[in-house]
């Protein structure tokens, strides 16, 4: 591999590394969406919530003269509950809606697949750098691109999850906005998917410019 192409590969891997960090941050944090309830003038507190792939947290925030509940960063009584995705027979005290839990389980499972693709891609990159096996960059690029697509699907599932929660009559929340964990997931998709495609492009062997070039460059037979 030429020096110019190697430089492009290193820059691409750096972008992919940033995407990996953002993907990990999005998966382990619970600020994908912030939910706000309908405001009642006679209430002294309001209950806002934020949630991610693994748990939902509600916070009772003292009300002031504003017409909105929050922001979520204000001090208040906080209560978090894990979704308990893979423990049948157990249910969350807060997350009582079967359909909503199915959305969350799907998003979490897809995110785990994404992390698996990231691990496989990273192993291929490490093996290629260790013994100059440049051909391993090609499967690595595909793994990273698949990881990005999984993140995108997880983002869409969570988006539908939030919409379903807001539209449900069983919840008190009527307003929402996507928070920084959601932004990390979107940025991770862009970096992983485009980085994977760029890595595949840079790792492909150079095509001959002329039909006879490959024959002229071939080693003579003995």
Swiss-Prot record:
Q: Annotated Gene Ontology MF terms?
A: calcium channel regulator activity; voltage-gated calcium channel activity
Q: Does the keyword Translocase apply?
A: no
* Membrane spanning residue stretches: 11-29, 109-129, 135-155, 180-204
Name the InterPro entries on file. Answer: PMP22/EMP/MP20/Claudin (IPR004031), VDCC_g1su (IPR005421), VDCC_gsu (IPR008368)
Tell me its family.
Answer: Belongs to the PMP-22/EMP/MP20 family. CACNG subfamily.
Q: What do we know about how this protein assembles, alone or with others?
A: Component of a calcium channel complex consisting of a pore-forming alpha subunit (CACNA1S) and the ancillary subunits CACNB1 or CACNB2, CACNG1 and CACNA2D1. The channel complex contains alpha, beta, gamma and delta subunits in a 1:1:1:1 ratio, i.e. it contains either CACNB1 or CACNB2.
Protein name stated in the entry: Voltage-dependent calcium channel gamma-1 subunit
Upper lineage ranks? Eukaryota, Metazoa, Chordata, Craniata, Vertebrata
Gene for this chain: CACNG1
């Amino acid at each position: 591999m030429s020096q110019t192409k190697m430089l492009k590969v290193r820059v691409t891997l750096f972008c992919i590394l940033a995407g990996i960090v953002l993907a990990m941050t999005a998966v382990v944090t619970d600020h994908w969406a912030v939910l706000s309830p309908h405001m009642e003038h006679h209430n002294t507190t309001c209950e806002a919530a934020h949630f991610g792939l693994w748990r939902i947290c509600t916070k009772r925030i003292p009300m002031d003269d504003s017409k909105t509940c929050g922001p979520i960063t204000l001090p208040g009584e906080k209560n978090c509950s894990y979704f308990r995705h893979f423990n049948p027979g157990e249910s969350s005290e807060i997350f009582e809606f079967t359909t909503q839990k199915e959305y969350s389980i799907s998003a979490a499972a897809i995110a785990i697949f994404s992390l698996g693709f990231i691990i496989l891609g990273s192993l291929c990159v490490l093996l290629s750098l260790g013994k100059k096996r440049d051909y391993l960059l090609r499967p690595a690029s595909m793994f990273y691109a698949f990881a990005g697509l999984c993140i995108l699907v997880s983002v869409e599932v969570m988006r539908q999850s939030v919409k379903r929660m807001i539209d449900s009559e069983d919840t008190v929340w009527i307003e929402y906005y996507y928070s920084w964990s959601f932004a990390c997931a979107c940025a991770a998709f862009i970096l992983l998917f485009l980085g994977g495609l760029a890595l595949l492009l840079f790792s492909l062997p150079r095509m001959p410019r002329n039909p006879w070039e490959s024959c002229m460059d071939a080693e003579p037979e003995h």
